[in-house]
A protein has these predicted regions:
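Flexible loop residues that form catalytic
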Residues: 38, 109, 153
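N-terminal pre-domain/capping segments
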Residues: 1-101, 127-130, 134-135, 141
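Short, electropositive alpha-helical surface patch
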Residues: 52, 56, 61, 116-128, ...
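Conserved beta-strand positions
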Residues: 33-35, 106, 150
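A short acidic, helix-capping loop that chelates divalent metal ions and anchors anionic groups
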Residues: 70-76, 112-117, 156-157
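Basic- and aromatic-lined ligand-binding clefts that recognize polyanionic substrates
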Residues: 141-164
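Mobile beta-alpha loop/short-helix "lid" or hinge segments that flank ligand
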Residues: 69-70, 101-114, 143-146
Length: 164
């Protein structure tokens, strides 16, 4: 049995010094550290390599979590947003491959949180989400990503997969 924890347990922001948390979770006896996807597109290849090497030195497996922003919603009714989302995920998955992360979890099928102040197309969002996840699966497999973990949210955060 392996045990892991999300770096954000100790953070108030969606970014942090992942090297610090690699050391911290290693000292605490964890095997896995989940980091946020959001900052990874800003990392250089050298920074990605350093992160991978540090995790390997500490015997920590990295995984990634993501609450997709509106502009990365693969279920959006706007085809340009869906295209942008697929481009974002393609880049993200390539970066995940560089750090050795083979699992990403989150509301990958939509966005987080959903904006209920605007009209919601539940059936369309569901159908586009399924279509988008099929595309994400192909991209992920090309990048060595083994698990696309779909997070169920509460009903106030999303309507596609929720706990209601």
């Amino acid at each position: 049995m392996q045990h892991g924890i999300y770096y954000a347990y100790w953070e108030h922001e969606w970014n942090g010094n992942y090297h610090y948390y690699i050391d911290k979770v290693a000292k605490l006896g964890y095997d896995i550290l989940e980091i946020a996807a959001g900052p990874l597109p800003e990392y250089s290849n050298e920074e990605l390599k350093a992160l991978k090497d540090h995790a390997k030195e500490q015997n920590i497996r990295l995984t990634v979590g993501y609450g997709p922003a509106l502009e990365n919603n693969i279920a959006s009714s706007d085809p340009q947003v869906r295209k942008h989302a697929l481009d974002f995920y393609t880049d993200l998955f390539q970066r995940m491959e560089k750090i050795g992360a083979t699992l990403i979890g989150g509301a990958l099928y939509s966005c987080w949180p959903i904006d209920y102040s605007k009209p919601v197309d539940k059936k369309g969002d569901w159908e586009r989400g399924i279509e988008g996840m099929a595309k994400l699966g192909k991209i992920a497999s090309e990048c060595g990503i083994e698990v696309l973990g779909l997070e169920c949210l509460n009903r106030f955060e999303n309507h596609v997969l929720n706990t209601a």
